[in-house]
């Protein structure tokens, strides 16, 4: 079985994941104030309790999504590092054959 890897493709994928990570982080940052501080529609106990419950769920959601965005960012970095590793390995292998340049 042969695995053909294009380091430039991995670098492009890494950049795309980095851009996606930034967009997701921005979207979650703009949504966090709205979902973590739900305003009750009235001052009665049921409205207050429901709004507090929704706010607590919003806080939990914000934490989980932040962790997800962080993990996505780490995955993108890993893809980029893999591409750099393949590129270095290719250069080292080419050097053993006395090939100079590309």
From Swiss-Prot:
| Keywords noted in UniProt | Secreted, Virulence
Gene inactivation phenotype reads: PE5-PPE4 double mutant exhibits a severe iron phenotype but secretes EsxG and EsxH normally. Mildly attenuated in vivo.
Which top-level group of life is the source organism from?
A: Bacteria
Compartments in which it is found: Secreted; Cell envelope; Cell surface
Among InterPro entries, the record links this protein to:
PE-PGRS_N
- Ranges for domain PE: 3-92
Q: Which GO terms describe its cellular component?
A: cell envelope; cell surface; extracellular region
Keyword Cytoplasm set for record: no
Summarize the protein's role. Important for the siderophore-mediated iron-acquisition function of ESX-3. May play a pivotal role in the evasion of host immune response by M.tuberculosis. Mediates production of IL-10 via activation of the p38 and ERK1/2 mitogen-activated protein kinase (MAPK) signaling pathways.
Family to which this protein belongs: Belongs to the mycobacterial PE family.
What is this protein's name? PE family immunomodulator PE5
* Species whose genome carries this gene: Mycobacterium tuberculosis (strain ATCC 25618 / H37Rv)
């Amino acid at each position: 079985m042969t695995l053909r890897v294009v380091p430039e493709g991995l670098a492009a994928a890494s950049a795309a994941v980095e851009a996606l990570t930034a967009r997701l982080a921005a979207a979650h940052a703009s949504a966090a104030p709205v979902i973590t501080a739900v305003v009750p529609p009235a001052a009665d106990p049921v409205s207050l309790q429901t709004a507090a419950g929704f706010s607590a769920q919003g806080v939990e959601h914000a934490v989980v999504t932040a962790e997800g965005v962080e993990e996505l960012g780490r995955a993108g970095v890993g893809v980029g590092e893999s591409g750099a590793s393949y590129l270095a390995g290719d250069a080292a292998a080419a050097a053993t054959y006395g090939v100079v340049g590309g």
